[in-house]
């Protein structure tokens, strides 16, 4: 079997794997990245500067994701000093 055809086969297989991977990670409901790559559980990709959180109109609300990002900001008066 000549080497070139072997390369082509391997390459197309790899491409198929990659496209599957891409499709799967896109369809999962985080910003298209698989969960391991999400920095600090930010699901909506604000670190990439993408708008497009569904409830962006209420500007003082973090994305509801995990428990440290889902708090409102500014915090309720109980936590403010003084």
Swiss-Prot record:
Compositionally biased residues, Basic and acidic residues: 47-58
Organism (species): Homo sapiens
Region annotation Disordered: where it falls in the sequence: 22-82
Listed Pro residues bias regions: 73-82
Protein name: Putative uncharacterized protein KLHL30-AS1
Domain of life where this protein originates: Eukaryota
């Amino acid at each position: 079997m000549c080497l070139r055809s072997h390369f082509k086969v391997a390459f197309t297989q790899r491409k198929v794997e990659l496209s599957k991977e891409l499709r799967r990670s896109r369809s999962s409901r985080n910003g298209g990245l698989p969960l391991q790559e999400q920095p600090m559980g930010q699901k909506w990709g604000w670190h990439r500067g993408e708008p497009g959180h569904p409830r962006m109109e209420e500007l003082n609300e973090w994305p509801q994701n995990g428990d440290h990002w889902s708090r409102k900001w500014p915090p309720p008066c109980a936590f403010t000093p003084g």
